[in-house]
A protein has these predicted regions:
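Conserved cytosolic headpiece of P-type ATPases
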Residues: 1-727, 737-738, 751, 762, ...
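Membrane-water interface at loop-to-transmembrane-helix junctions
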Residues: 732-750, 770-774
């Protein structure tokens, strides 16, 4: 018999558990018996296959063809060295791919879903993979269901099972027994792994985990998530292909020019001409570009993770630098998320948090703590901060919540949702069933018939309503969040939203969630950086405005409005309306999407924060969706590009700063690589047009491109971050990474290095062509190593600490310098890399000319400054 056909008591008995859950020992035994609650992963690619895939790159294929033709034409040494260097690059690429997979696995581990289980009679938060058969799992709106289970307690739970059944509408769940065989979609007393709760709450007993779940049985049919290339990577790939095609065209022209100049065409002439063309191709193609960008993005992602921002989609790393609007929630993000009750209002009196409270006034506090889902166990507070504040206030005034909950057990409920802005529960108090409701004052004020007093109760008059609204406004203007607490008698525990009326008012509770200490500074940083912070909250307009003014989001030039103000505006009207609004209060998820879309239509890059299941559409709509790691639902995290592990607005600003620096570092690395390649191209073209011998062999350029260029480029990618990036305006949305400024730098610096290289060639040519080639190669190689220091900043770096603040760059220069000198001085390597021995004077000339490139570029930077 299937669990859905059995009584819940029988299911519990069959699984050896009860409503208090498993003990920790039982859970560990069951984990050994049933295994971890995770799907078997698809086989990862064999490292050898990964190695072979490195040869699929378009640029590498061109080099392989060049090597093969070189070998056929008799230049065996060049062919062998090209293959060796390409192989080394393939090995490095394979190792980097494996490391990237490991990094991705660690990030997945950091953002793994959790579950609330009852063990040893207490609610505990555990990783989803540690849930086991027999566990009692608490499911609330926004939670993913991480295993299959039978519902044993239900409070209006609705579940999105579209991942399992394809049904787009949420399914209403129940706990009653079902008769006969039922298809998956009709098993309404079961919950299945991969679905998520959209409304209400429930408890279930886990019946199967891992590959035994329904989703596990069809796991082979599920699409695995694959990391797509980011827009930057795609752009650079396309750039590389276009560059290659252009270079092939130029190579054909050079080949034709060389053949045209010759007296007659024979194998030797063709071989020499082809060597020229190959040298040009190798000089132009930035072999390491793609892998270096990947490495820099990977390192940047790890750095962001260490600073509490987990990147879930790699393109977010690039997008962070362009963010111009941050739409942020208030509670927990801009504030501390540590609500404390400051004042209560009862029967015309405002009572301070530290004043004595009598029994009548205490009933207001007790009702607030009973109509409440928060839990306190072993010093850990689980639940909504507002509800935790009510419980803490009750305990502070010697009204023990656990005893009250045992005495007045909850028999029914209507969970809170952002549309109703209310929560209701039913308890038996004395001989009567009482429905307790807490929620927004503006929602409840029109549903009150009577008011509790020190002497009993009386009718709720127009004067009472005016007083209630007045006190609510006063509290809100103080930046306090206000809840009304009401009660009424009911005849049954089966309540519905239609019963939420005809209340007796107990009073108001005013609490405060103070701003985080760092919020004001983060807002100031945003404004300096040309980023506009906007508060979007479900809270009261006056409360939101008070906090926004305190931290600097709202000033005399900004407006604060309620969400309903935008409901009747057309998209065109909304585009105009959003321009001067800094605070939106009482917003719905639909409002959030419209606000984000309006700014996007105006050409801005928008970041949006969210935590609830209803925030998922807005998070997906935003350019950078940011989910809360602590309070956020699994659905929100799944929709987001980035997850904050500390729920802190300041972390978003830090992430933007890191994103800007990362993008700038990638620009520096690209500028470094392409300016060096430009120098090589110019040198080869100059030699061709001047009918000089080819200045480099292919092996020389490959040595530079793949060995001595890669390390400085990676070092530039991890250049220490500069805070001055937050003094700049956001990068335009569709701006190419190869801006006019970067292209100018590439051309100018390429010319400088190219000129120095050809000077070295002419100096060496005094002796012979082999020495000329060796000096040109050495100067180009060392100039590019020195040029790494030029690319650290747009400003001069000589005589500054910035020159030496990157240990990776110093190390890269040292390694490259040692490798170059080994090639020049070790006889065996001289033969392999086709270099001639140099005299001390020639070697010093190479050093001097290479240093000259640094000096000239630094002088040009000073002139430009």
């Amino acid at each position: 018999m299937n669990p859905y056909q059995m009584k819940k008591e029988d299911v519990l008995k069959m699984l050896g558990t009860d409503e208090n859950g498993l003990t920790q020992n039982q859970a560990e035994e069951n984990q050994k018996k049933y295994g971890k609650n995770e799907l078997a992963e698809g086989k990862k690619k064999n490292p050898f296959i990964l190695f072979l895939e490195q040869y699929k790159d378009f640029l590498v294929i061109i080099l392989i063809i060049a090597a093969i033709i070189s070998g056929v034409l008799g230049d065996i040494e060049s062919a062998i060295v090209i293959f060796v260097v390409i192989t080394i690059n393939a090995i490095l690429g394979t190792v980097q791919h494996i490391k990237a997979e490991q990094s991705l696995d660690s990030l997945k581990e950091m953002s793994a879903p959790t579950a609330k289980v009852i063990r040893d009679g207490e609610i505990k938060v555990v990783e989803g993979k540690d849930v086991t058969v027999g566990d009692i799992v608490v499911i609330e709106a926004g939670d993913y269901v991480c295993s299959d289970g039978r519902i044993i307690e239900n409070a209006s739970l609705k579940v999105d099972e579209s991942a399992m059944t394809g049904e787009s509408e949420p399914v209403e769940k129940q706990e009653t027994v079902l008769d006969g065989e039922k298809p998956l979609g009709d098993r309404v007393n079961m919950l299945y792994s991969g679905s998520f709760a959209t409304y209400g709450r429930a408890k279930m007993v886990v019946t199967s985990v891992g590959m035994e779940t329904e989703i596990g049985k069809i796991a082979s049919l599920l699409k695995s998530t694959q990391e797509k290339k980011t827009p930057l990577q795609e752009s650079l790939d396309n750039f590389g292909k276009k560059l290659s095609l252009i270079i092939i065209g130029i190579c054909v022209i050079v080949l034709g020019l060389e053949l045209f100049r010759s007296d007659g065409i024979n194998l030797t002439v063709f071989t020499d001409a082809f060597v020229f063309a190959v040298a040009l191709a190798v000089a132009a193609i930035p072999e390491a570009l793609s892998s270096i960008v990947t490495i820099v993005l990977s390192v940047g992602t790890q750095k962001l993770a260490k600073e509490n921002a987990i990147i879930r989609k790699l393109q977010a790393v690039e997008g962070l630098g362009s963010v111009s609007i941050i739409c942020s929630d208030k509670t927990g993000t801009l504030t501390q998320n540590k609500m404390t009750v400051q004042k209560i209002y009862f029967d015309g009196q405002i009572i301070d948090k530290d004043d004595e409270i009598n029994a009548r006034q205490g009933q207001l506090i007790i009702d607030g703590a009973l109509c409440n889902d928060s839990v306190q166990k072993e010093g850990q507070e689980i639940g909504d901060p507002t509800e935790i504040a009510l419980v803490n206030f009750s305990e502070k005034h010697n009204l023990p919540v656990e005893k009250m909950r045992e005495k007045y057990q909850r028999l029914g409920e209507i969970p809170f949702d952002s549309d109703r802005k209310l929560m209701s529960t039913v308890h038996k108090i004395g001989d009567n069933y009482k429905m307790l409701t807490k929620g927004a004052v503006d929602v409840l004020s029109g549903r009150i018939n009577e008011v509790k007093t020190m002497d009993g109760k009386r009718p709720f008059t127009a004067e009472d309503l005016a007083e209630l609204k007045k006190v609510n406004t006063e509290f809100s203007q103080m930046g306090l969040r206000v809840l009304a607490v009401c009660e009424r008698d009911v005849d049954t525990v089966d309540i519905s939203v239609e019963d939420e009326k005809n209340y007796i008012l107990l009073g108001l509770v005013a609490m405060q969630d103070p701003p985080r200490e760092e919020s004001a500074e983060a807002v100031r940083k945003c404004k300096t950086a040309g980023i506009r912070p906007i508060m979007i909250t479900g809270d009261h307009l006056v409360t939101a405005s008070a906090i926004a003014r305190k931290i600097g989001i709202l000033d005399d030039n900004g407006r604060a409005v309620e969400g309903r103000k935008i409901e009747n505006l057309s998209d065109e009207e909304l585009d105009e309306f959003v321009s001067d609004v800094s605070v939106y209060a009482r917003v719905s998820p639909e409002h959030k999407i419209r606000i984000v879309s309006a700014w996007q239509r105006k050409g801005y890059i928008v970041s949006m924060t969210g935590d609830g299941v209803n925030d998922a559409p807005a998070l997906k709509q935003a350019d950078i969706g940011v989910a809360m790691g602590i309070t956020g639902s699994e659905v929100a995290k799944d929709a987001a590009s980035m997850v904050l592990t500390d729920d802190n607005f300041a972390t978003i600003v830090k992430a933007i700063e890191n994103g800007r620096n990362l993008y700038r570092n990638i620009q520096r690395a690209i500028q470094f690589l392409l300016s060096g390649n430009t120098a090589g191209i110019l040198a080869v073209l100059y030699a061709s047009f001047m009918a000089l011998p080819v200045p480099f062999k292919a092996v020389h350029l490959l040595f530079i491109n793949l060995l001595t260029d890669s390390l400085p480029a990676i070092a530039l990618g991890v250049e220490p971050h500069s805070s001055d990036v937050m003094n700049e305006k956001p990068r335009p949305k569709n701006q190419s990474i190869l801006t006019k400024k970067v292209l100018t730098n590439i051309c100018v610096e390429g010319v400088v290095i190219g000129v120095m290289t050809m000077i070295a060639f002419y100096v060496g040519f005094i002796r012979n062509a082999e020495v000329a080639s060796t000096m040109a190669f050495s100067t180009l190689c060392l100039s590019r190593l020195v040029h790494g220091f030029n690319c650290k900043s747009d400003k001069p770096v000589w005589f500054t600490k910035k020159m030496w603040n990157n240990k990776s760059m110093i190390g890269a220069f040292f390694v490259g310098f040692v490798l170059l000198n080994a090639v020049l001085l070790v006889p065996v390597l001289q033969g392999i890399f086709a270099v001639a021995p140099l005299t001390i004077a020639e070697l010093l000339t190479v050093y001097g000319l290479s240093l000259g490139t640094f000096v000239i570029v630094q002088i040009l930077k000073m002139i430009r400054k």
